A protein has these predicted regions:
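Catalytic metal-binding/acid-base residues of hydrolase active sites
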Residues: 33, 63-64, 103, 162-164, ...
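Metal-dependent phosphoester-hydrolase catalytic domains
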Residues: 109, 167-193, 198-264
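N-terminal, active-site-proximal structural segment of metallo-dependent hydrolase catalytic domains
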Residues: 1-93, 171-176, 250, 264
Length: 264
């Protein structure tokens, strides 16, 4: 699908160019493929790592197969995590990933479950009459959700997730994730940063909690953002300890990227 401003459609070259332009040390990516035919059998998070010059990366599958086509939940024989320093084998799958230039000391995974029911979801589709994708509603079954975390040698643990689009279910998942993030932070003596597509509008991710949203910016759709679904949450960073990175469309995602620079 053509995503403005990229008029040539998705490609590995476009991915490398977009990731390199972000000039980031750590990236958390959602909705990525691992050895799936629809993306030419590419390990997308490894390609992301290559584009940004990162050694460490990990992919955590949500499902085996392709969403919206044929997929199944993971079973006991499926690897829960594939990283740059592992030799595990995994069938074509879909999930989330992290790539980091900063050394990763330990990877973590948390299962968040899924909604037993789906719901109509607004998604971008090809348009025959416009260079901008059209928006339409389709009924979508919710896939299993999870969180992937990387404990870094710089004193931070980065948490990545893609929560359910079903109201209420996503709030329950976020509550569980926040609790886990604080536990991991305490165990590793690191500061937690929670990143990802939370499928929740502004203020809801931090309501009635000690967490704060470091970036308040509409992120979806990327060619004319009307709502914020993507966040960077912290339970302890002060405004003078970070600055917000510039935001611009990448042409490879229907979401805008957000980022912060930690000030030392």
């Amino acid at each position: 699908m053509e995503i403005p401003p990229n008029k040539s459609g998705p490609s590995l070259a476009a991915l490398h160019k977009a990731i390199a332009a972000l000039a980031t040390d750590v990236i958390a990516v959602q909705e990525i493929d691992f050895n799936l035919p629809r993306s030419s059998g590419v390990n997308q998070i490894a390609e992301v790592a290559s584009a940004m010059g990162a050694r460490d990366w990990a992919f955590a599958p949500s499902v085996i197969g392709t969403p919206d086509e044929k997929w199944r939940k993971l079973n006991d024989g499926d690897a829960r995590l594939i990283a740059n320093d592992t030799n595990q084998i995994l069938a074509g799958s879909y999930g989330i990933g992290i790539a980091s230039k900063i050394k990763v000391l330990k990877w973590h995974r948390l299962e968040l479950g899924n909604s037993p029911i789906g719901m109509p979801l607004v998604v971008p589709t090809e348009s025959e009459t416009s260079s901008r994708p059209k928006i339409r509603a389709i009924y979508v079954h919710d896939e299993p959700r999870l969180a992937l975390a990387a404990t870094l040698e710089n004193g931070f643990t980065i948490f990545n997730t893609h929560l359910s689009f079903v109201p209420g279910v996503n709030l329950s998942q976020l509550k569980k994730l926040k609790k886990w993030a604080l536990e991991i932070g305490e165990e590793t003596n690191t500061k937690a940063l929670l990143l990802g597509d939370l499928n929740l509008p502004k203020k809801l991710p931090v309501a009635l909690s000690k967490w704060s949203s470091l970036v308040t910016q509409n992120t979806y759709p990327s060619w004319g953002a009307k709502v914020q679904f993507d966040y960077i949450l912290s339970d302890r960073l002060r405004p003078d300890e970070y600055k917000i990175s510039p935001i611009s469309p990448t042409g490879i995602s229907d979401h805008l990227p957000i980022g912060v620079e930690i000030l030392r």
